[in-house]
């Protein structure tokens, strides 16, 4: 894993919308919220209907309810504060991992062209750092299913 040492809490903005606190971050590379939430690695987040954002998902992770919205180059995390965002959500969503560097490294390996195809197909997906028990249960339950069926 390549840590993105350039990502700090100084890169975020805090605010409140309709009485709900949020933390907003801009410039997150290689992040597609819809792709992350729909790729089959988590099952406790659902799309928010009627959102004013390009896409928004709400759900529970580590016992905390959160709603995450994405617009062009901006992620907004509702129902959290700067401390919780720094200690939980940065790691959960892999915002501290330099996915662009990982992609460059994979694409530079001309001996494995199939990896380049995988990178292109999975653009924007992040590996969520989920609670181990939740990930295990989701894996076991989904063994007889496929992603479209789930």
Stretch-by-stretch model annotation:
Residues 1-150:
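HhH-family (HhH-GPD) DNA N-glycosylase catalytic core used in base-excision repair
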């Amino acid at each position: 894993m390549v840590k993105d040492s350039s990502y700090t809490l100084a890169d975020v903005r805090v605010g409140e919308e309709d009485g709900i606190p949020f933390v907003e971050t801009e410039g997150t590379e290689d992040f597609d919220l819809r792709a992350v939430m729909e790729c089959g690695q988590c099952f406790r987040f659902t799309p928010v209907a009627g959102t004013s954002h390009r896409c928004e998902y709400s759900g529970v992770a580590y016992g905390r309810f959160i709603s995450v919205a994405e617009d062009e180059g901006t992620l907004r995390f509702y129902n959290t504060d700067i401390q919780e965002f720094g200690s939980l959500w940065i790691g959960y969503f892999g915002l501290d991992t330099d996915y662009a560097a990982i992609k460059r490294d994979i694409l530079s390996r001309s001996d494995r062209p199939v990896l380049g195809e995988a990178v292109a197909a999975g653009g924007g997906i992040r590996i969520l750092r989920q609670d181990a028990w939740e990930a295990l249960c989701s894996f076991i339950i989904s063994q007889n299913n496929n992603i479209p069926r789930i």
